């Protein structure tokens, strides 16, 4: 359990690859002070149409879908947002102000 007095946010990142396609994301862990802006980079290579996803896994929990790609920028109820940018094959995850409760493992995935 994380202490309420903890001044940093730790985010762990893991790489995922699929056959013939690839995803590269920010290497972790990333440590930020509370209320700092967060950007987790995700770039991909694919020969086919792509569906992009961000998953989050909190301590002792199963991974859950955070965001999926769409034509427009998508924002979830926790304040995370991501927009697919086809010109540079990216789907970066952003949050303007992180909280201690955002400490988790984040996965960028491609289907």
Swiss-Prot record:
UniProt-listed InterPro entries: Ig-like_dom, Ig-like_dom_sf, Ig-like_fold, Ig_V-set, TCR_variable_region
Protein name: T cell receptor alpha variable 18
An individual GO BP term: adaptive immune response
Positions annotated as glycosylated: 41
Signal peptide positions (record): 1-20
Function: V region of the variable domain of T cell receptor (TR) alpha chain that participates in the antigen recognition. Alpha-beta T cell receptors are antigen specific receptors which are essential to the immune response and are present on the cell surface of T lymphocytes. Recognize peptide-major histocompatibility (MH) (pMH) complexes that are displayed by antigen presenting cells (APC), a prerequisite for efficient T cell adaptive immunity against pathogens.
Annotated SUPFAM superfamilies: Immunoglobulin
Subunit annotation: Alpha-beta TR is a heterodimer composed of an alpha and beta chain; disulfide-linked. The alpha-beta TR is associated with the transmembrane signaling CD3 coreceptor proteins to form the TR-CD3 (TcR or TCR). The assembly of alpha-beta TR heterodimers with CD3 occurs in the endoplasmic reticulum where a single alpha-beta TR heterodimer associates with one CD3D-CD3E heterodimer, one CD3G-CD3E heterodimer and one CD247 homodimer forming a stable octameric structure. CD3D-CD3E and CD3G-CD3E heterodimers preferentially associate with TR alpha and TR beta chains, respectively.
GO cellular component: T cell receptor complex
Disulfide bonds: 42-108
Chief location category: membrane
Pfam families assigned: V-set
Ranges where the Ig-like domain occurs: 21-111
Keywords: Adaptive immunity, Cell membrane, Disulfide bond, Glycoprotein, Immunity, Immunoglobulin domain, Membrane, Receptor, Signal, T cell receptor
Subcellular location: Cell membrane
């Amino acid at each position: 359990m994380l202490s309420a007095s903890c001044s940093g946010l730790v985010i762990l990142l893991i790489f995922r690859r699929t056959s013939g396609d690839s995803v590269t994301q920010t290497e972790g862990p990333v440590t930020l002070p509370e209320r700092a802006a967060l950007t987790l980079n995700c770039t991909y290579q694919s020969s086919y149409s792509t569906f992009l996803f961000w998953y989050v896994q909190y301590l002792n929990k199963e991974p859950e879908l955070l965001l999926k790609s769409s034509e427009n920028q998508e924002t979830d109820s926790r304040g995370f947002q991501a927009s697919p940018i086809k010109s540079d094959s990216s789907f970066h995850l952003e949050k303007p102000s992180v909280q201690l409760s955002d400490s988790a493992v984040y996965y960028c995935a491609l289907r």
